[in-house]
Each structure stands twice: as structure tokens, then as C-alpha cells.
Regions:
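Short, conserved phosphate-binding/catalytic loop or strand-edge motifs used
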Residues: 115-119
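C-terminal accessory/tail domains of diverse enzymes
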Residues: 1-113, 126-233
Length: 233
């Protein structure tokens, strides 16, 4: 491995991460209780009044809040629709997340495409500019069909939750070459027909493999391409 690649890997490890894992067959309160026990804090409570989405939360030893929320896109009984939303994580937290997922699976949690489950990966957008985000959009547009094939995404999910880069967005993006994030946001929302409610969580523009709505509202670059399956390990 040459020095340049080694440096790139080390820089990647400095990025912040947020993960949303959809599952069913486990109640949100039970998942939060299990997480609190796993973290060794025993602290979990109903936080729906603050977070909405029928949320139960658990706290780890660092005081970070891990949320278990209802997501209507998940199949199954309402009380067992459960989406784990992590706090801001770092590279060294990946093993912690993996072990928590194992605990949830052993407690009965199920997650696969037949249950309407997916994974959303958020990477901190710090350091990105309109230029780097334009580059990323072009790279994604050139490779997302390969990604979809590799991840075996079904056509229904792609048409609803994991849409490819809108060609109108890409055309305007490359024509105007925005110099500010505000100008980039204008192109994003207008091209996706979602100029209304730009600050709304469920703005329709979010349902793309490459989701820049998260960039403008949460400061992350979000990928919606991943199907979810809790595997044996």
C-alpha cells in the first residue's frame, strides 16, 4: 500500500458517521432497554415528547443518546417497527455498533428487504464544498446502477426510496457550477420538485441514493442505497 493511499485511509477514519438501521419484530422499549444494559448504564426512557416518532432512547457510557424510533415504511405491527438511530460516531465506534446489532438480533430483531428495511449511512459533510459535492454527484451518477446491481436493490425500492441522481439536477449542477451551498441547495430542491418545506425532515428530495437534503439540514452526506439484513455472526 503506497503512502498516498495510506494517508487517504487515515483521513477517512477521521470522518464522523451516523447510521440508521431499520428492523422489526422487536419493540422499541425493549430495544432501548437492551441497549442500555449492553452499554452498562441501565439508562433508557420514553423520549417521544422530545423526539417524536414514538421514540425510546438509551444512553451509553459517554452520555450519547441512541434512539429507537417508529418508521412507517417498515413492515409489521406498529409496536414492532423499530429504527435504530445512532448518535454521531467515529471509526473506533464501529465495533460497538456491530456488537449492539448482534444483541438486538439475538433478542429477536429481524431486518431484510422483505420487511421493508434498509440502512442509511451519514458521513459528516465537514470540509465539503459545492465543488466537491458536484464531483461526488457526477461520480455517483456514473456508478449508481452498478451499486444497485451489486446490492441487489429491487425496482420498487429504487423507485421509491433509493432513486438515482435526477438528470435535471445533474444537468443544472454542471451548467451552473454553484459556488455557494445556498446556490447548490436551490438547484437540488428545484430540480427534484421539492422546493416546499426545505427544512422538513420528510422533504421528498431525500429519497435518493445520494441524499443532499441531509447535507443542507443535518450537515451530512447521506447514502440511501443499502439494503439491510441482520446476519449471523
Amino acid at each position: 500500500m503506497n503512502e498516498r493511499i495510506t494517508k487517504q485511509i487515515e483521513e477517512m477514519k477521521k470522518q464522523t458517521i451516523g447510521v440508521e438501521v431499520e428492523m422489526n419484530n422487536i419493540r422499541r422499549d425493549k430495544a432501548a432497554e437492551l441497549a442500555a444494559a449492553f452499554f452498562g448504564t441501565g439508562r433508557f426512557e420514553n423520549t417521544a415528547s422530545r423526539n417524536g416518532y414514538y421514540t425510546w432512547s438509551a444512553w451509553d457510557a459517554s452520555g450519547r443518546e441512541w434512539k429507537f424510533q417508529k418508521d412507517v415504511s417498515i413492515a409489521g405491527p406498529d409496536d414492532k417497527k423499530c429504527e435504530l438511530v445512532t448518535p454521531i460516531l467515529h471509526y473506533e465506534d464501529i465495533e460497538l455498533l456491530q456488537e449492539l446489532i448482534r444483541k438486538l438480533r439475538h433478542a429477536g430483531a429481524k431486518s431484510d428487504a422483505t420487511r421493508g428495511c434498509g440502512v442509511h449511512i451519514h458521513i459528516g459533510a465537514k470540509g465539503h464544498t459545492p465543488q466537491t459535492l458536484r464531483n461526488l454527484a457526477n461520480i455517483m451518477a456514473g456508478h449508481e446502477n452498478l451499486l444497485a446491481d451489486a446490492l441487489n436493490l429491487d425496482s420498487w425500492r429504487m423507485n421509491r426510496y433509493c432513486k438515482t441522481v435526477d438528470p435535471r439536477f445533474l444537468k443544472n449542477l454542471n451548467k451552473k457550477k454553484p459556488k455557494t451551498m445556498a446556490a447548490l441547495a436551490d438547484i437540488w430542491y428545484k430540480a427534484n420538485g421539492a422546493s416546499y418545506g426545505r427544512d422538513h425532515h420528510y422533504n421528498e428530495s431525500r429519497y435518493h441514493m445520494l441524499n443532499y437534503h441531509a447535507t443542507f439540514t443535518k450537515g451530512t452526506v447521506c447514502c440511501h442505497a443499502y439494503r439491510c439484513r441482520l446476519t449471523e455472526s
